[in-house]
Amino acid sequence: MQNFIFISPNFPTNYWQFCRELKNDGMNVLGIGDQPYDELKPELKDSLNEYYKVGSLENYDEVYRAVAFFIFKYGRIDWLESNNEYWLERDAALRTDFHITSGFQTEDMPRIKYKSKMKEYYRKAGIATARYHMVDDLNGCKAFIKQVGYPVVVKPDNGVGASDTHKLSNDEELKTFLACKAENHPDVSYIMEEFVRAEVNSYDAIIDASGNPIFEAGNVSPMSIMDIVNDNDNSIYYIIKDLPEDTRAAGRAVVKSFGVKSRFVHFEFFRMTENQASMGEKGQIVALEVNMRPCGGFTPDMINFARSTNVYKIWADMIAFGGTDMPVGEHYYCPFAGRRDGKNFVYSHEQIMQKYQKNIKMVDRIPDALSGAMGNQMYVATFSTREEMEQFYSDVLAVTDGDAAAAQAALSQVLALGEPTTKALTLKPNLSPAVKPTTAVTKIPTRAVTKTSRKGRK
């Protein structure tokens, strides 16, 4: 039996499903977290063979001792993962210290965590990147801006999501940013990039031990997460019904360039919505950033709804067996609509639930830790056509206050982007465009599942 340590299995709240599928596949699933055992969801308790509570996951020594305890009790650890961006460096440090070779090591972290380091590997994959400058002083930043023009985007070189990301449109905003950085984050390295006029398209895939995708999907974020966070706006994004071929090719090329194996990945690309001389034409793919973990929040569930499948199982099967026999069924659009508290919406929650009762798959309050980028009240639904999805967005997000006309116009402008306008992806001729094409799912022989008992440690 293989031993799998899952770091922070209780957050995000849907991650217990990864543990359940691992256990169903006969893995010995060992959780380490800082939530008291009695407060864990019953489903998570049932999905773990044992749980070790630490005082704080931020305390490396405590987590180190927890891993050492599991090794003493169960022997060699085969896998250690959190599937969580926040803990990727911690995961790598633990693997390195305990010689767990099934995932990234500490030496791998710069290229997958630092946005400036990612660009080299994107270029190796033959994919265009935005020009950038490592933030130094006013003169250095202004020299870069003289080349690319305003606006520019600044963010931590090693950051999570859109946290502390800002669009600067003039010299005064630049000076304000530099002053705030000097006062609050003098030791944090920031990257400045030219602004890309685009929507975000993602490549979401489960990659096997040979670096081949066994499942592929993608989402579209027509609204900038940076703007959603900074403007306290509603949130929309959706799983696209069919993954565009240029996104697929770009995703596979990046998998190869970064040397990804045995992971669930979420790669983000800009799809340009207008021509930009420095990067290319409308519809072209431009690199944004790699995330060596599943897309955040409830997106794995949305992918399940959009593909009539179970990505938690596909991932667990990849870990346990190297492949999966989980089928992929009918494809749908799966939109996420996140309402922001404090807005006056035309349709009440009850009216939305009544009108879309046959379509809605999930309704919930967003955890505070995720609400900045996702809103406060979420609705997830499925639709066969884009027109149905657009009407859903118009109904859920329509407001009654004085800004109603402007809000509706902005939403209409976003939805008017329509299906991604694709361009043929041209890669460098000395680099193959991707790994060998695969079907959406790789078959494996049926394996017997070993039943295991549940143990807990408070």
Question: Locations of the language-model features?
Answer:
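ATP-binding N-terminal substructure of ATP-dependent carboxylate-amine bond-forming enzymes
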Residues: 1-107, 139, 394-411, 415-438, ...
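CheY-like receiver
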Residues: 66-70, 143-144, 177-180
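A conserved helix-loop-beta module that forms one wall/lid of the active-site cleft
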Residues: 95-164
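Conserved ATP-binding module of the ATP-grasp superfamily
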Residues: 128-130, 151-154, 165-202, 227-235, ...
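Short, well-ordered beta-strand elements within core beta-sheets of diverse protein domains
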Residues: 166, 194, 239, 377-383
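Peripheral (often C-terminal) accessory segments that flank ATP-dependent C-N-forming ligase machineries
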Residues: 316-458
